[in-house]
């Protein structure tokens, strides 16, 4: 699975599971799982709420990473195949 490949990639860089990149990756996996679940169960409102909460957490982490280190942010966005944050 993708997660195992990413974990080995992270271990090569000797970063902990508490790193921003790993947290964003974990949230992205949860988001993809919940999205596929909600395609089957459209009226599962608790899962919809959980999805919105996880999306918010990931968005805040990405905003933090974007401010702190733009290069790592760009690499992560490209690697996870997600869109960039909207800027105001």
UniProtKB/Swiss-Prot annotation:
Write down the Pfam families for this protein, in alphabetical order: Ribosomal_S15
Its primary localisation, in coarse terms, equals plastid
UniProt KW keywords:
Chloroplast, Plastid, Ribonucleoprotein, Ribosomal protein
The reply on keyword Ribonucleoprotein is yes
Any Gene Ontology biological process? translation
State the InterPro entries in the record.
Ribosomal_uS15, Ribosomal_uS15_bac-type, uS15_NS1_RNA-bd_sf
One GO MF term, please? structural constituent of ribosome
What SMART domains does this protein's entry cite? Ribosomal_S15
State the compartments where it is located.
Plastid, Chloroplast
Residues spanning the membrane: none
Check the record and name the PROSITE patterns matching this protein: RIBOSOMAL_S15
Which family does the record assign?
A: Belongs to the universal ribosomal protein uS15 family.
Q: Give the record's subunit note.
A: Part of the 30S ribosomal subunit.
Q: What is this protein called?
A: Small ribosomal subunit protein uS15c
Where does this protein come from, organism-wise?
Lobularia maritima
Q: Which gene encodes it?
A: rps15
